[in-house]
């Protein structure tokens, strides 16, 4: 069957409304609230999260507000629980409307593989991460995904839209490895073309590659 890379155990969506500083400027309260809503739906605590895929646009205003919201939620978590923070935008830039979906894919692959990929181009930690007791680690090389004893690996994914819409997902690794081995030896490969000659050519290419 199809492989399951992660399951969604909780989510939260809201809008900053009058709390935001401007149309394109987010709100600390709105972002922290949406993360807490997702944790509550998943019936877990901040200590259960091993990795957060941040919205992380790389802007001074946006990143500072997001880090304040994350510190607000995770700052009281146990200091002996390792928790990592990253953003796919450091690798690919801002993917516009696909940014949130790309973050889900990254977090799902990290859960499935048990490895958190590095966040690129981070050389100096920002002030918001080094004040007091930081709840996050920004890794510059691949690291093992933290696995709490007797619990599945879990990740949070944030995506914030222009106009103040905030979304946060809680993902966790699927039970039983996310799938099962198939015993099928034959598979149907659909092939189509605009005419028979091109269909025969395409079929021959498939036979060459799969043979």
State what each model feature region is:
Residues 1-193, 197-203, 208:
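Condensing-enzyme catalytic core of the thiolase-fold
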